[in-house]
Amino acid sequence: MESTEKQKVSMVSLGCSKNLVDAEVMLGLLARQEYEITTDEREADIIIVNTCSFIKEAKQESIDAILDLAERKNDGRCHTLIVSGCLPQRYQEELARELPEVDIFIGTGDYPRIAEILAEKSGTDEQLCYIGDPDFVFDETLPRLNSSPAWFSYLKIGEGCSNRCSYCIIPKLRGPYRSRPLEALVAEAEQLASRGVKELNIISQDITRYGSDMEDGTTLETLLRRLVQIDGIQWIRLLYAYPDGISDALIALIRDEPKICKYLDIPLQHISDPVLKLMRRRSNEQQIRELLAKLRREIPTLALRTSLIVGFPGETMEDFTSLMQFVEQARFDRLGVFCYSREEGTPAATMPDQVSERVKRERHRKLMRIQARLSFKRNRELIGTTEQVIVEGYSEETELLLKGRSSRQAPDIDGQVYITAGTADVGDIVALRITDSSDYDLIGEIQERT
């Protein structure tokens, strides 16, 4: 008699939160087709690796994960290994040749066909590749299996990127920027709120470009004004806001709307005008400094995060010194520093005056030492203040301590708050008095639930 046991699927999603949303859509589609989802790869009949290929380290992490999980086909129940996302979109032929243990490759525009593709695979032993144009735009009618904790989720408001930064391969992998329809986003946010989500993290390659490809005048501000009206949503956080797209209207909305976190992630990449010009960034040093001054003036409690690149081709010691001085002066609450990754197919890859890996690493260390000191000082300034904190469970070190995040901390990238006194349930938002701090984390006591 034919077995009716459901096929089990496990997903490993690598890279950014935007990639995670793609993975969640694939899982939702498979769950709708009655596949059973498991977080244990050892139990899985089908394993999907959703990859990133943005920089060298991300590519290596993806390859390592693929090779590791390929072993499951030898020592476990896995019979189908799928590689999806940016890596196959970029390196289809090379991967198909070098990784015969992979059964299916799926690009960034074809993942919504995951169930159909698996059905096609059941009729052949051949390796299959589905790498089309990256033109898909997710909408709220597709099922999405939220893999984040129940109280927060990412809301991806657009696909692709139309910026042409000289170091970045994303436009080739994801296509031009396409805004999702306003009503579709509101509908998805309402669905998330109905499931208990309290925190929306707004993401795309550049959230300030939202609506620029629409003809009805829709903007990011238009969307935010709708989202704040949704019952149950208490925090709305803005990630990946390009500096040249931050309008006075957006600043005023962040300042005045209680549901919008006093938090802004602005990828600046550098401060030296010669480097910014080589990077093909649209903002110059003066514009960046004026924007930061305005943000600090209009929203004194704003937590600012940025990302910077060191070792870009042509970056001189003078350029790097300017960058160090800028970090000292700007006093970012959070800072990510990346060594420039020479990516084939980008204009920067063929630029002269490439910086050595040794110099890149040294510059990275110097900037991170500066930021650790500044972050410690910024956190010390919060001692004695009261912050809104979402409780996320027990500390990994001891069940005597709860942990959470303040509205000044984004998921996964910004540090945590350790709670030494008071009780609350996971997912509660509480008022917490800060009593101590470290370089990147805060410590405090619950005052009241909100």
Swiss-Prot record:
GO BP term (any one): tRNA modification
Residue intervals of the TRAM domain: 380-448
Residue numbers binding [4Fe-4S] cluster 2: 161, 165, 168
Taxonomy, superkingdom: Bacteria
Enzyme class: transferase
Cofactor mode of binding and number, as noted: Binds 2 [4Fe-4S] clusters. One cluster is coordinated with 3 cysteines and an exchangeable S-adenosyl-L-methionine.
Reported function: Catalyzes the methylthiolation of an aspartic acid residue of ribosomal protein uS12.
Radical SAM core domain residues: 147-377
Gene that this polypeptide is encoded by: rimO
Molecular function, one GO term: metal ion binding
Pfam families: Radical_SAM, TRAM_2, UPF0004
HAMAP family named in the record: MTTase_RimO (MF_01865)
Membrane-traversing stretches: none
Name of the featured protein: Ribosomal protein uS12 methylthiotransferase RimO
NCBIfam families: 30S ribosomal protein S12 methylthiotransferase RimO, MiaB/RimO family radical SAM methylthiotransferase
EC numbers on record: 2.8.4.4
Residues involved in [4Fe-4S] cluster 1 binding: 16, 52, 86
Family: Belongs to the methylthiotransferase family. RimO subfamily.
Tagged with keyword Protein transport: no
SMART domains per UniProt: Elp3
InterPro entries, A to Z: Elp3/MiaA/NifB-like_rSAM, Methylthiotransferase, Methylthiotransferase_CS, Methylthiotransferase_N, Methylthiotransferase_N_sf, NA-bd_OB-fold, Ribosomal_uS12_MeSTrfase_RimO, rSAM
Catalytic activity: L-aspartate(89)-[ribosomal protein uS12]-hydrogen + (sulfur carrier)-SH + AH2 + 2 S-adenosyl-L-methionine = 3-methylsulfanyl-L-aspartate(89)-[ribosomal protein uS12]-hydrogen + (sulfur carrier)-H + 5'-deoxyadenosine + L-methionine + A + S-adenosyl-L-homocysteine + 2 H(+)
